[in-house]
């Protein structure tokens, strides 16, 4: 049984959405997704999934806010404390099981309304035992970037080239509020945040709500034929971010494991030749290159392919043609969508 994305809706994609609460944003995105899919949530949708986290909402047991805004009142509704892409994976399995025909997936972010955003980041790193008095919670990204550079031979210029590519590409995306026309020198000489990363190499935050509707093949056919078919889904888990003593610096083995599993399901043996483009993690500039390496999209020579323009929009294999998170912004649990 194949699974398709039959509808998508969103609201926001701005650094600040002052006019609506996160629950109202969820509602607006849901209405647009159901209209795009041509479904009635009270009649056609069998289950609902929301990706959210108590710390971001500022409310304990925040899943109690999930059903009403997305049409899931008195219906099967579950919440996942993780990225929206995990919700898609869960919905995919639910549909493949045969127990559900149509599943709606929702994820949102309103970081502009989080007064203690810095403190939330600090708390996630276990400040009680492991990371006492760490002035900048982004230190892990700096350590990881430095380890990756040392292992791979990637230079500061290569990291900056990723930011230049994605920031400039985002200018063509109306949903990329952090895009900018920048040069290599401007990125390298911008304000240092945590070595080796500068301001332009760290994604900002964006308010958004996104809703995606998945359906089984037989149902999807009834809603037309212009769908996005999901051929492979896989995931793997590493140690948590707080367990820095166990982290394999400069590598991302969980991403490699997940990619190999997804490729196998989709029947892909050579991803660089059998796929046309990739949207990968880039909330920090170095992560795009590390992700490409772990995904098998260039091997150990990804930085040399970057130099040649291979990953540019007009190159042999465009990467993050949307502008990535460096242009769109970090949308908390909605980033994967």
Task: Annotate each predicted stretch with a short phrase.
Residues 19-27, 60, 85, 135-142, ...:
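Electropositive phosphate-/nucleotide-binding environments in soluble metabolic enzymes
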Residues 17-19, 114-120, 171-175, 241-243, ...:
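Short acidic, glycine/serine/threonine-rich loops at helix termini
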Residues 14, 52-102, 106-140, 178-204, ...:
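Conserved catalytic cysteine-centered active-site region
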Residues 134-184:
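N-terminal leader/propeptide and maturation segments of large enzyme subunits in energy/redox metabolism
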Residues 56-64, 242-247, 282-305, 331:
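Short glycine/threonine-rich loop-to-helix capping motif typified by GTGT followed
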Residues 1-23, 127, 161, 192-261, ...:
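Condensing-enzyme catalytic core mediating Claisen C-C bond formation in acyl metabolism
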Residues 1-83, 90, 148-155, 177-186, ...:
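Conserved active-site "lid/cap" helical segment
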Residues 42-52, 78-79, 103-108, 157-164, ...:
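Beta-strand segments within the central parallel beta-sheet cores of soluble alpha/beta enzyme folds
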